């Protein structure tokens, strides 16, 4: 590892990840980079992380939100792979290892490994 980024909160870390993903996309020639996010996810309360969040209740009142996020079900590897394969604007996947905003949701064994495989 050549670099490390320290921040004060998960929200700040997610905000930086979103910015880096978009920058990566622009550097690769993608005009409108998109990030796959999961339904019922929570990523923070900045405008970018609210836009990535999968809870309409949390987003309410803060519109217009940012575009560039594609939602898929949390533990549905087939849908994730289909979207990642067929949408050429996808530059990243933002996923919580364990979802907690809508109740504790642990992914099935092998899910995160498969997500990583799709990304590489």
Where are these regions (language model features)?
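Catalytic PLP-binding core of fold-type I/II PLP enzymes
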Residues: 105-120
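Proline-rich low-complexity regions
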Residues: 64, 97, 107-108
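Short acidic, glycine-rich surface-loop motifs adjacent to enzyme active sites
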Residues: 87-104
